[in-house]
């Protein structure tokens, strides 16, 4: 995941529901893989209208949105990695972090 989730940035600094979409779009780096986690309970329910506007704005900027699975070919080996508990600024509690 390379982009912050809604709950990680909303209400922090100057990010509000009015400028959330623009904020996330400003973080996208065209030359890199950008990964945004979408939560069904947020973008799919309580913020569905806002998420719909995000999708339209992304398309108007010619930003391609695809599921991560499209980058995997059949039988692609997945490397093993270790994880540990860690903290991420703006996130309550601990999260699993790849080490």
Residue ranges and their predicted role:
Residues 1-30:
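Alpha-helical scaffold elements lining the catalytic groove of polysaccharide deacetylases
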């Amino acid at each position: 995941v390379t982009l912050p989730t809604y709950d990680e940035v909303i209400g922090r600094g100057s990010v509000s529901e009015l400028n959330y979409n623009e904020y996330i779009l400003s973080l996208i780096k065209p030359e890199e893989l950008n990964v945004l986690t979408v939560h069904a309970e947020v973008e799919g329910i309580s913020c569905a209208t806002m998420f719909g506007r995000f999708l339209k704005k992304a398309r108007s900027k010619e930003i391609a949105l695809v599921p991560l699975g499209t980058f995997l070919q059949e039988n692609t080996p997945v490397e093993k990695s270790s994880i540990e508990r860690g903290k991420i600024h703006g996130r309550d509690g601990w999260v699993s972090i790849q080490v």
